[in-house]
Amino acid sequence: MAATVAAAPRSNQDPGVASPRHRTWVIPLTAAAVMVLYAASAVLVARDQSGSDFHRRTAAAIAEGHLDIRPVPAELRTLPDPYDAGSNLDVRVDRDVQDLAYRNGRLYSAHGLTIPLLLVPSELAFGTSPPNWVITLVAACAGVAAAAWTLVQIRRRFLCDLPDWTTAAAVAAVGLCGPMWVVVSVGNGYEAAVAVGFALSMTGAALLLRSTERLGSTDPDRSLERARAAAGSAVLGLAVGARPTMVVTAILLAVIAAVVVARRGSRPTASLIADLLAVAGPFVVVGICIAVANAVRFGSPTEFGFGFQLSVWDMTTYPQGRLSYLAPNLLDHLAAIPGHRSSFPWITLRPTIGGDRPSVHTSEPMIGLIFSAPVLVVGAVAALPSGRAPWARARGLGTAVAAAATTGALLLVLVSWPFNTSSLRYTADGAPLLLLAAAGAWLTVRSDAPLASGTGAGTGGRRLDRAWLVALAVGIAVTAAVQVPT
């Protein structure tokens, strides 16, 4: 999530209404249940596809003291045009260099170095690294834990009278609706990068949210808050090294910085600068390291290797970043209709759409967010017509929800921009933050007008509760169904 203005926890119940009995155990239990389902999908369905072990191969290279993956097949060096998809087909398939980046006679992973660096200790200690499906599973579970922590913070600081089941339902939505559960069930190298990006962005956001309780205030001892902000900033920077699209999370840092400046008051300039450095400094430092690594490998601080990939088409001539790609890709990410199957569970991912890439829009197996995560619709319906009243009583929460929604939406735009093809794993970059924003909107609006019954929700809130629970059940069922092998 993002920055919030410091405020005491808001009680939204009438004085004569008994507080709901707290069963806080239901929240970690829900998170644990999500992780168990992730593990089941990873063990029963996931596959470590041949040619997708580029993270492990890069980690092994770093452990040996270099960045490039060795050896380079002699056949690749002798090709007149090593990037031509027809000429390099046999080498790509037979010599296990599919989707690696090739520049100046060296092979590299076409990804950032965050995951390989995390794997280096395993390489040094055991001479090997976990398979991609394990990396994906562990990272996804860490992301769910961080999302649960974020939602618990929201309740403690702003909506302290929320029943525990509502927070648990929000955790279930983030974990089981949308693409992340499906990503775990695939568990290849690209999915590992997506899952690590999810884990790091959620953890960074949670740390930043926690830091805002006193960061920028007049409290004389803010060292712990600065440490949390610095850790969150660094973790968001590392997320960029896992998924370059996560650079958009700099929006969260900008919101935090704005809050710090807004709270300045009579504080000395040196104190303000120290707070701002804690928020932005680590992200910038990590970003510089990423840029240097990119420049060393690919000659440009912004090139992660996609422009040099040995792929099913020539990436050196691929027309990247066309406006014409946005609309069809976004339509797929949001509204791709699931495919039909003749037996239980009767639905599956929409099949691959092929074509003459890149002139024709293509798609990997897909399902749109409105089908796999209909709680997003409930969150939007809750937030848009609610007016200012609910947010005026919890301005910090409104800031956080807006920052999460904006960042998630921009992530969907960013993944729709480079290539004329859509993929479910691309959707997973922005969906978690959108789900957090939807949950925040639901929890805020449903708590705005309590009843004397002690349910913590007004009449409109109870309707929202029913809508959320129905949408949650549908989203979980659909997301589970599309994982069943055909």
For the regions a language model picked out, list residue spans one by one:
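Membrane-proximal envelope and lipid/glycan-remodeling enzymes
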Residues: 2-486
